[in-house]
From Swiss-Prot:
It holds the Pfam family DNA_pol_B_2. This is Probable DNA polymerase. InterPro entries: DNA-dir_DNA_pol_B (IPR006172), DNA-dir_DNA_pol_B_CS (IPR017964), DNA-dir_DNA_pol_B_mt/vir (IPR004868), DNA-dir_DNA_pol_B_mt_lin_plsmd (IPR015833), DNA/RNA_pol_sf (IPR043502), DNA_pol_palm_dom_sf (IPR023211), RNaseH-like_sf (IPR012337), RNaseH_sf (IPR036397). The keyword Transport does not apply. The lineage of its organism: Eukaryota, Fungi, Dikarya, Ascomycota, Pezizomycotina.
């Protein structure tokens, strides 16, 4: 049994990490000003007092520490980080804690932040190795530094407690050594080799093809056209292929060893020298090194093979739950029924027939395991159902494999050994894979069933009527109010409800009927997808777990391979395979070299990978129109793409480069800037489009667009790729045509494959992964990798989420070879990576380029949508990729109020359309009774309080909870500077940044004038 030791610091500090891309509406449970003040104080204090002894001689006020035992907790009240003595209290608590540690062992120390009000925890994403004699001052500085770093990178809100969690390892490593926290870097710096670098070889070889500078000629073989020179340092053996145009040179030591080989080729008026050993090209002009090119070692995306037989081993599984109130309007979910369907019969389980929820779920899973090698689909499994069964799966079965993305388990493969039915018989081990169907077919089951014309429709059930006391209820039909969903409105009409009237309505019977409809509808949906995918592409959907992975597999199977003639192939005009069946099955070769990047190259290109544009230019405006770009990302994928083997170069001419460039940027005084940048605004990292001067990585074509609008670009280095116009054109055109010319499931499938391909190309395959590990395996992982989250599921079984890449600090502490581990990790990843960051970054860049000329005169933009005063020219309107469509049936928007990104109101002359991302809409498309008066108040700087239902989930506790949380809705737009006139916000101006990515000046114009303001504010009723 693993023993855990706890001590708790009671404090205010950041807890939850929220993504801030897109500048979502600011929903704050509490003001984060206190947090930012604490962080600023600590950073300023450390900067101003670099030699300050953190451990003050002042006697701490609270030093009492009880004996620490298994699962014992001790609370220590701290107010904030603003008082240095409170840091000393924490140091003393840690010191006394460390003194109680076993001297013969090393411990893994984790940090957990807790918010008491919302009863939520989050781990600081780094564990530390500590011993009996670890300096508590150093470790606490490391903890504070890490939390400060996270607070700068993410949006954080205050917490109440900070837990220190220790876990004993089974061995001892050397005394841990701590280093300053390494900040993430996006600027990858390189320079042209200078001096006596082994790469330049300047001391060995002259930078010319003129042989008179090569030294004393010692031999001339005219027959072989070879000349040998001695320059006093080395012997130069020159094979002249074409005099003065192409030479092949061996560099030989004086003891007759071959040192290097290089080729010299005349290059215009200069020289191109290729060092064969290092695979590097040096360019000289007038005896001066002007450029170095280095082809990169990269793999490529390989074609995938088609399946020979269809995998029809599919089950559909679901769990039914009800809510148990826990006070203050909150509740927790309890599973009371479950079941699965195999295409012929359904097996259902009801909690009244079992002694507990656990036994009911266990019985269902064991019965599913009788279907060996089946894939069990469960809709929204990764977000909901997994929480009820994860501990059962780990404790009762063997977990063979987990596929995860971020915090979610997408699928889990388990096995179980069934005892022989007859004496002397052989035991059988069966496996099943439980997967989330929602990741393959996003959307609600009800809507999907309608869109795909599934025979069995999702049922209607009074969810709110169920409670722990009426599970065997038989009586009158539940009141009509139970058939009204506050989010979706009426499930059935009042007439339909009246027609259902009965005094023998049975909770058990109706639950089972509803459950069976759900699992049958899901089974039919997945089988239809399986049949269509196999008959069309000869691909089994069970090979992949997400829609984007399926789209990429279709591309790699059908569109990427070269066409090779085969015998006895029959074409069918109704089958897409007829277009591509003539492919060699045994050895497929790709039409295009789609590079798989890793290491420094991947980091540089990923630094140039920016998301969509979401900005407010004019906050309040009358009489406008809304337009959406049809299939923006698929259209962008038909633009020229960077493929082939990338070459690192120091070429300064932007027009000669197609690829990714690190450049120094100087912007003009432009109101709608071209280039994006990640910058901390008010302590939070955001994607903005600033003016100013900075250095960063960008796609070359976006830099060329910037030059057209007055930007000054100084190229520092770049990765040049081959330019191809057609890697994805065939794929996009094919599915766009199906989407535009078909209906039903074919249309939905084509739309899915069209829109999800791009996302897979940019996935980060080097991120964290989730595994179930033994204690020894966990100990070994903690020696080399950052453990983000871990908890014990069962004896010697741990749920562990950790970084795939080894951590240099942990490797140094545990005396592991970081370089070797990194190399092995890179080699392992190369075979697994099936993405191409260069394609993703170029696609995102092309999408911004395509939209730029249309947003110049817009009031608001969000990735592929614009709001403009004048309708677009008819040449831009139409069906299909590359055209715009008028939103809201082309209606004139009488008034629009834009408060923040994805927070706005549109008034169509009394009829309102409200966008408020993160807050659920009511059935009438309003948001918690927000109206135009509320938006005008927000526009004027006031706030509005909302109460929102939030679902929380905990794998560790195996629970799903429902809470009503209070949110303070404010006008927190800060991606551009607000401009005022007569005290009213009427316009925005880009932020200005410097080389350190700091906002140094906020507005181009301080006041836009009274006449302009009146023109915009006047409401034309």
């Amino acid at each position: 049994m693993i023993k855990f030791y706890f001590t708790t610091f009671h404090m205010k500090f950041p807890a939850r990490l929220f993504s801030t891309s897109g500048n979502r509406a600011n929903f704050e449970e509490n003001s984060s000003n206190e947090v930012q003040n604490q962080i600023k104080y600590l950073k300023d204090f450390k900067k101003e007092n670099p030699k300050f002894n953190w451990e003050s001689t002042t006697e701490p006020k609270h030093m009492i520490l009880s004996n620490i035992g298994e699962y014992e907790k001790n609370d220590f009240n701290l107010k904030s980080l603003l008082n240095i003595n409170e840091f000393n209290i924490n140091v003393e608590l840690l010191r006394q804690l460390f003194m109680k540690l076993d001297k013969n062992f090393t411990y893994a120390l984790g940090v957990i932040l807790r918010n008491v009000d919302s009863n939520t925890n989050i781990s600081v994403d780094r564990h530390f190795l500590v011993n009996f004699n670890t300096d508590p001052v150093i470790i606490l500085q490391q903890i504070y530094d890490r939390i400060i770093f996270l607070s700068e990178k993410y949006y954080l809100v205050p917490v109440d407690k900070l837990f220190i969690k220790l876990r004993k390892l089974n061995f001892k490593v050397k005394n841990p050594v701590f280093h300053p926290i390494a900040k993430e870097k996006t600027n990858i710096h390189t320079t042209i080799p200078k001096g006596k670098s082994k790469l330049s070889r300047a001391e060995f070889v002259p930078h010319t093809m003129d042989l008179k500078f090569y030294g004393v000629e010692t031999k001339h073989d005219k027959e072989k056209n070879i000349r040998i020179f001695d320059n006093g340092k080395v012997i130069l053996k020159v094979k002249i292929i074409k005099d003065g145009v192409y030479h092949l040179i061996d560099v030989i030591s004086r003891d007759n060893r071959l040192l290097y080989q290089f080729e010299d080729v005349k290059h215009g008026d200069g020289l191109k020298r290729y060092w064969i050993n290092d695979n590097m090209y040096y360019y000289y002009y007038d005896n001066t090194l002007v450029n170095v090119e280095t082809p990169q070692k990269v793999g490529n995306i390989e074609p995938a093979k088609r399946d020979k037989t269809q995998d029809k081993k599919i089950l559909a599984f679901d769990i039914e739950t009800f809510q148990v109130p826990t006070g203050n309007g909150d509740s927790t979910m309890i599973a009371y029924a479950c079941g699965f369907y195999d295409g012929k019969k359904s097996l259902t389980y009801y909690i009244s027939d079992f002694i507990s929820q656990r036994e009911m779920l266990l019985a269902c899973i064991k019965d599913m395991l009788k279907y060996d090698k089946h894939t069990v689909y469960c809709h929204n499994f990764s977000k909901f159902d997994i929480n009820f069964i994860i501990k059962i799966l780990v404790q009762e079965f063997v977990v063979e494999k987990i596929i995860s993305k971020d915090l979610d388990i997408l699928s889990i493969k388990i096995s179980y050994k069934f005892e022989p039915k007859k004496k002397g018989g052989k035991a059988e081990r069966h496996t099943i894979t439980i997967a989330d169907s929602c990741r393959l077919l996003p959307g609600s089951l009800d809507k999907l069933a309608k869109d795909h014309n599934i025979i069995t429709k999702k049922g209607k059930f009074p969810y709110k009527f169920v409670n722990k006391d009426n599970l065997e209820y038989v009586g009158l039909l539940p009141d009509y109010e139970y058939y009204i969903d506050p989010k979706k409105g009426e499930m059935i009409t009042l007439f339909e409800w009246a027609a259902m009237y009965t005094n023998k309505w049975s909770m058990r019977k109706e639950t089972i009927i509803y459950l069976e409809k759900d699992i049958k509808a899901l089974y039919q949906l997945m089988m239809e997808m399986s049949n269509n995918t196999y008959s069309t592409f000869r691909i089994n959907i069970t090979r992949v777990k997400t829609a984007s992975a399926l789209a990429f597999l279709v591309y790699r199977t059908i569109f990427l391979p070269n066409e090779v003639e085969e015998e006895n192939e029959t074409n069918s005009p109704n089958n897409i395979l007829s277009l591509f069946d003539k492919k060699e099955e045994k050895k497929l070769t790709p039409k295009y070299f789609l590079p798989k990047l890793k290491g420094r190259l991947e980091r540089a290109v990923r630094a140039a990978y920016f998301g969509g544009r979401n900005e407010i230019f004019i906050p309040i405006i009358n009489n406008i129109f809304s337009f959406d770009f049809n299939s923006l990302y698929p259209t962008a994928m038909m633009m020229p793409m960077p493929v082939g083997i990338p070459v690192h170069t120091f070429c300064k001419n932007l027009n000669e480069i197609f690829g990714f460039v690190r450049a120094k940027i100087i912007t003009p005084a432009i109101n709608i800037p071209v280039l994006p940048c990640r910058v901390k605004v008010n302590g939070v990292q955001k994607l903005i489009f600033p003016i100013g001067e900075w250095t960063g990585w960008y796609f070359s074509e976006e830099l060329k667009l910037a030059v057209e609008y007055g930007y000054k670009i100084e190229v520092l280095e770049s990765y040049v790729f081959e330019k191809r116009d057609d890697p994805f054109k065939e794929y996009i055109e094919h599915f766009a045509s199906i989407k535009d010319n078909t209906k039903g499931s074919k249309k939905q499938m084509a739309k899915l494959l069209l829109n999800t391909l791009y996302g897979r190309t940019g996935m980060n395959d080097s991120a964290a992964e989730i595994k179930m590990l033994t204690t020894n395996e966990l100990d070994n992982i903690q020696l080399t990798n950052n453990v983000i989250h871990e908890f014990e599921v069962d004896d010697d079984k741990h749920y562990v989420r950790y970084d795939k890449k080894p951590c240099p600090v942990l490797c140094a502490q545990s005396e592991k070879n970081y370089e070797l581990l990194s190399y092995l990790d890179g080699e392992k990843d190369d075979g697994f990576i099936i993405n191409s960051t260069s394609i993703a970054a170029a696609t995102a860049s092309w999408s911004r380029i395509l939209m730029y000329k249309h947003i110049i005169n817009s009031a608001y933009t969000d990735t592929d949508s614009i709001f403009v005063e004048k309708p677009l020219d008819s040449a831009f309107i139409g069906e299909g990729c590359g055209k715009f469509k008028a939103e809201y049936n082309g209606q004139l928007i009488k008034r629009a109020i834009f408060i923040s990104g994805k927070l706005y109101l549109l008034d169509f002359g009394g009829k309102l359309e409200i966008k408020c991302k993160g807050i659920t809409k009511n059935k009438d498309n309003t948001t918690h009774n927000l109206d135009i008066n509320d938006f005008e108040a927000l526009y004027n700087g006031e706030s509005r309080v909302l109460f929102q239902e939030r679902w929380g989930r905990s794998l560790e506790l195996g629970t799903v909870t429902v809470k009503y949380q209070k949110y303070n809705l404010i006008s927190g737009y800060d991606k551009r500077e607000k401009l005022y006139s007569l005290g009213k916000w009427v316009n925005t101006s880009p932020l200005c940044i410097n080389e350190n990515f700091e906002v140094i000046s906020k507005a181009l114009v301080s006041d836009v004038g009274e006449s302009w303001y009146r023109k915009r504010i006047h409401y034309n009723k």
